[in-house]
Amino acid sequence: MQTVVPDRLQGTDGIRRETKSAKDSECRGSTPLQIFLEKGWITEEFMELYVYCYVKNQKKSAAPKKRTIVIGWDPRDTSGNFTEAVVRGVRKAGGEAMVLGVVPTPLVPLFMLHNGADGGIMVTASHNPKDQNGIKLFLPFHGMKPLPSDDIDLTRNLLKQNFDAIKKLPLKGGRTDCQQKALALFQHFSLLPENSWIDSPDTLKALILVVDPAFGALTGIAAQIFKEAGVGKVLEVNAGKNGPVNLRSGVADLEGCPRITADMILKP
């Protein structure tokens, strides 16, 4: 039976699927696109192909020069196979990769606009479980998301590609680690008076605040910002590396932490 190819591979906000390694026996003999469409999986090779086409489209729509692309991700890909495939796809397309590493999604367009970059990529499946991953794209105009017509154009470009040829391409663009600069910008932006409802740091001195980042990208970041904002006591739960990201969507309750005890509150 012939595979039906939609006009747009994207859903409401980019692409998301259950992840599967391209080296898995169930993927052998199939192209990244076939695996995506027929089996409903996203492989690291599909991610490389997808962002390669995105960067090529960005280069096509502007004056010829090196495209600078900001790349961030959430912590669900502990192997780094998918995130590194994204960096590789950007560089093979001739893009200069500004790598932020694990950061919250809004920081990608924020850092992109702050630095005058030409595009942004966030590797995440948002609130979906840890066994899934995906890609959100940002455009240089005000950090906007692609319109449906942009998605269609990207899909058409992707359908023309031969991934075997892309695999053999050299890395044309460079790579710069920008995580510390990006996190400093995020904290500064979050604490700006015009972005806050806090009249004075003294306002929150008596507050005890529980922060649950659900083992996601805001682990360690949100809690620190609240401390800097003047919250008297900040308790962070469900934080750390390689945890169950977004267990039961990460918002229903404090998974794995049934109660906040007095000892937790009184601990220095």
List where the protein language model places each region.
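N-terminal small/polar loop signature for handling phosphorylated ligands or for N-terminal nucleophile
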Residues: 56, 64-132, 224-268
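Bulky hydrophobic/aromatic "packing anchor" residues in well-ordered structure
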Residues: 13-15, 108, 154
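Gly/Ser/Thr-enriched, mixed-charge loops and adjacent short helices
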Residues: 1-4, 18, 131-268
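An N-terminal, well-structured beta->alpha segment
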Residues: 1-86, 92-93, 175-209, 217
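Helix N-cap and loop-to-helix transition residues
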Residues: 43, 104, 147-148
